[in-house]
């Protein structure tokens, strides 16, 4: 459990710093009285669920573009720990399992990402 926590903290650090490098201005997201606010303006989260581990990395751009074409502005992803830690203490965030790369790809298309780290995932996943 301690190793998972450390890995999770490292992962979020990578995601935060990768986003900070690509974005030059700070954004402010908050809950208003009756709506979410992004930079002080009303914001509706229109989210699509994508499972990056089920999509070959070469198709990430295409799937994200399809979500955007449907009017989505956010991608929700689960972190499937049994993919990233198939052997206790050995973590794999490379290739198709590269969460930071997936988040950067979404950002490249102007999409936001909501990351849900689990351990429970409601995605028919073993």
Give the label of every model feature segment.
Residues 26, 53, 89-92:
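A generic secondary-structure micro-motif detector
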Residues 23-35:
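Short acidic, Pro/Gly- and aromatic-enriched capping/linker segments at domain boundaries
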Residues 32-54:
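Boundary/entry segment of secreted carbohydrate-active catalytic domains
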Residues 1-5:
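Positively charged n-region of N-terminal signal peptides that target proteins for export
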Residues 60-126:
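Aromatic-lined substrate-binding rim segments of carbohydrate-active enzymes
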Residues 30, 37-40, 69, 108:
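Extracellular/periplasmic catalytic domains that process cell-envelope and extracellular macromolecules
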Residues 17-22:
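Sec/Tat signal peptide C-region and signal peptidase I cleavage site
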Residues 7-16:
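Bacterial N-terminal signal peptides
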